[in-house]
Amino acid sequence: MTEPVLKNLTSPPKAGRHELYRWCDYIELRCITHIDQRFSRDALAEAIEEQADTDADDPLNESAEDDEPEDNTDDRAAANDAHEQHAAFCFKHLRWREQVFAEHWPFTLDEHAIEIRVKENLTEIHRFYLSLLLSASLSYVPKKRWRGLTGLFEQASTEIMKQLMPKGAEVHPFGAAETTRYTGHLFDRLTKLTKDVRGSLDLKKAHFAGHDSGDGGLDIVAWHGLGDTRKGIPIAFAQCGCTASGWPDKMLQASPARLGGHLNTLHKWGTYYFMPLDLSTEIDGTMDWQMFHDFGEAIVIDRLRFIRLATDYDIPAAPVTAHDHVDEARSLKLS
C-alpha cells in the first residue's frame, strides 16, 4: 500500500527562529492539508507548544542553558509568550510572500495576518508553487514518494536553465535518473562531458568505485559552441537540491572549487544552484536573501525566481508540476 504523501505534520520543523523559510513552508503545508484549507497564527503557536511539551529540545530555545530549567508556571508562561511571538513573526513574513509572489501566491492572508487560506481557484502557476512547496518539504514526505517530486523539480530546473542560456546553447540533464546523453559509469559520463566542453579530465576509471553511476555533483550542464571547435567556450554547470537544511553544503557541488582540479577548461564555468525553497526576505526596505552568510559562489534560483522566470518566459507549468502529490496533499483534510 502506498504511503500518504505527507507524514508527521503535527510536528513543527526543527528549525531556529531565523529560518523563516522553513517555518512559513510549514504554515503553508498545514494550510493545504487542513480540512477547511486554512491555518491560523494561534494554531501554529499551539503546535509549537505541544511539540515543546513532548520534546526536550524546543526548536525555539536557541539560548538554552546546559542545565535543565525548572518546571514552573513562570517558565511555561514565558515559553508560551515566545511561541506566540514567533508565530506572529512567521505570519508577518507571509505578508512578504504575499507581496513578492503577488497573484502567483496560491494563498490569501487576512488584513491582520492572523490566518492564511488557500485560494478558491488555483491556476497552473499556483499548482506549480505548491509542487515546489512539497519538494522543499521532503522531511514530511515518505522517502518512497520523493522521486515523484525531485524528478519533476530537476526537469523544471532544466527548463529554466534553457531560458537563462544564450540562444544556440546546449543544455542537458546530467543527473543519473534524467539523462539520455550521459549514460553508464560516472567516469564514462564525465569523459563525454569533458569532450563536450572542450576540456581535459585528470582522472582514471580506477579512481572510481566499480559500479559508480552517480552524478558527480552535476544535475544540469550547458555550453555554447560559438560556431567552431576551438577551446574557450561559455560553460555552466548546475546542481539541483531539495534539502531544507543542507543546501549550503550542496550549493558548490557543481563549482570549479570542487570539480576544477580534475575537469580542466580554459576558463572557469558558471555555477548554478536550483532550490525549491523561498529564501527571499526584506532587509532595510530592500529585497535580500535569508541566510546570506551561508552562500557560496553560485547563482541561486529559489522559489521566487522559479515562479517569476516561469511566468516571464511563458514556461508551461503543468508538465513540471507534481499534480498527483498536490492533489493528494489537498485531499488529506487534516485538522
What are the roles of these predicted feature ranges?
Residues 1-152, 335:
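Nuclease-adjacent, charged terminal/linker segments that flank catalytic cores
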Residues 227-292:
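Active-site/pore-lining binding-face segments in mid-to-C-terminal subdomains
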